[in-house]
UniProtKB/Swiss-Prot annotation:
Entry similarity comment: Belongs to the short-chain dehydrogenases/reductases (SDR) family.
Entries under InterPro entries matching the protein: NAD(P)-bd_dom_sf, SDR_fam
Protein role: Dehydrogenase involved in a cyclohexanecarboxylate (CHCA) degradation pathway. Catalyzes the NAD(+)-dependent dehydrogenation of trans-4-hydroxycyclohexanecarboxylate (trans-4-hydroxyCHCA) to form 4-oxocyclohexanecarboxylate (4-oxoCHCA). Is highly specific for the trans-4-hydroxy derivative and shows only weak activity with cis-4-hydroxyCHCA. Can also catalyze the reverse reaction (4-oxoCHCA reduction) with a higher catalytic efficiency. In the reverse reaction, is highly specific for 4-oxoCHCA and cannot use either the 2-oxo or the 3-oxo homolog as substrate. Cannot use NADP(+).
Highest taxon in the source lineage: Bacteria
Catalytic reaction list: trans-4-hydroxycyclohexane-1-carboxylate + NAD(+) = 4-oxocyclohexane-1-carboxylate + NADH + H(+)
Organism name: Sinomonas cyclohexanicum
GO molecular function: oxidoreductase activity
SUPFAM superfamilies: NAD(P)-binding Rossmann-fold domains
Its EC number(s): 1.1.1.226
Chain sites annotated for binding NAD(+): R20, M22, D41, D73, V74, N100, Y164, K168, V197, T199, T202
Name used for this protein in its record: Trans-4-hydroxycyclohexanecarboxylate dehydrogenase
Length: 259
């Protein structure tokens, strides 16, 4: 299969949590539009299989692999520096970082488990910080785009999601602050806030769609199309933005018709 376009031609993108779900979709869409992709994850078998699939599909006429799998524990800074180093060694640079890895946890302040709280913050927020810290030295010379995946739980309150919401709000704050700090290097930093998306992580959730004006979950492709835009030069004057992609769920209070 040949490329769909050259919107991110020859850019090098590292995506955390990319072995499956939204991360895998992001990697495939970026590769389809010309990027070299680094699939970073703890899931070795799935990550390597995805890299092989992308290489088989998108190296036609190029004569080399366009995807690389690297083992990554997002809570470990040395793991991050090794992943960035592998990306630069293989492809020569790093242009795009997609901080996609995350976990979804439940619990109010009253009943949340303390260890689970710490684990959620460590993966969903500190993991983003460590990824950015590791990536910036590789991006400083030529600039780049950092895309932090948050959630609508980082835009509004979320009942019974204390740790998850705290982490996702933290991602928004980290994004805005880092956009100010890294702007002089022409490194753009934006956050993406999906609503409910059809992924393995959300497959078991039971919910209605009364609060979503568009009346459905998002497809992973729809989120990936936004990632593609932010990774490309089409968004060259966007930084510090928090972009909701939620079918209108955070647009307002969708009251019952008889209210």
């Amino acid at each position: 299969m040949s490329r769909v376009s050259d919107r991110v031609a020859e850019k090098v993108a590292l995506i955390s949590g990319a072995a499956r779900g939204m991360g895998a979709s992001h990697a495939q869409v970026l590769a389809a539009h010309g990027a070299n992709v680094v699939i970073a994850d703890l899931l070795e078998d799935e990550g390597r299989a995805l890299a092989e699939k992308i290489n088989a599909e998108f190296n036609t006429g190029i004569g080399r692999d366009v995807a690389l799998f690297v083992h990554l524990d997002v809570t470990d800074y040395e793991s991050w520096t090794a992943a960035v180093g592998a990306a630069v060694e293989r492809f020569g640079t790093l242009d795009v970082l997609v901080n996609n890895a995350g976990i979804f946890t439940r619990g109010s302040v009253e009943d949340a488990d303390v260890d689970e709280w710490r684990r959620t913050i460590e993966i969903d927020l500190t993991g983003n910080f460590l990824g950015m810290k590791a990536a910036v030295p590789a991006m400083k010379a030529a600039g780049g785009s950092i895309i932090n995946i948050s959630s609508i739980a980082g835009l509004v309150g979320f009942k019974n999601r204390a740790a998850y919401a705290a982490a996702k709000w933290g991602v928004q704050g980290l994004t805005k602050t880092s956009a100010m700090d890294l702007g002089p290097y022409n490194i753009r930093v934006n956050s993406v806030h999906p609503g409910s998306v059809k992924t393995p992580m959300t497959a078991g959730l039971k919910r209605g769609f009364g609060q979503i004006p568009l009346g459905r979950d998002a497809e992973t492709q729809e989120i990936s199309d936004l990632i593609l835009f932010l990774a490309s030069d089409e968004s060259s004057f966007m930084t510090g933005a928090n972009l909701a992609i939620d079918g209108g769920e955070t647009a307002g209070n969708n009251l019952r018709q008889d209210a």
